[in-house]
Amino acid sequence: FMTAVNAEGVEIHVARLHNTIEARDLKLFVHHPSNLEGSTNNNSIVLHLAHGNIDFLFTGDAEKEAEGQMLILSSVRLPEVEILKVGHHGSRTALSEDFLAITSPEVAIYMAGTDNSYGHPHQETIDALTQIDAMIYGTDVNGTITITSNGETYSVSTQN
């Protein structure tokens, strides 16, 4: 990857807290990390994509520690979202009650391999998402998951 980037002379930008990229009706906000310390998972870049009236939150491998940092930073205003990419493959180490209460996703997507050795997603995570009536999709069950949006509505389609 870096060989191709260097060959093309592409300028590299490191994502930083509060960075914003705008293009037409799309806005991309960086919500995390505020600094790089602790575990690699908790240094995951957390991105909020606003497409018109539809909001997505991509949490990478962020765990409860990173969620807590975002919740206590007054400069980070986590949005209520339609679509949440669940942190850390649906592990019990991610998705705190406070984080869920604020983001309140309609759709939650986790990424995990079938019969993975970590047992992802963990039942506690599925239960928490079920309690808020989120529609739950996972790559282990649904295969490829595609979200299509026109900025006013969205639809979910799956491979399986």
What are the language-model segments listed below?
Residues F1-N160:
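Non-globular, low-confidence helical/coil segments that flank catalytic cores
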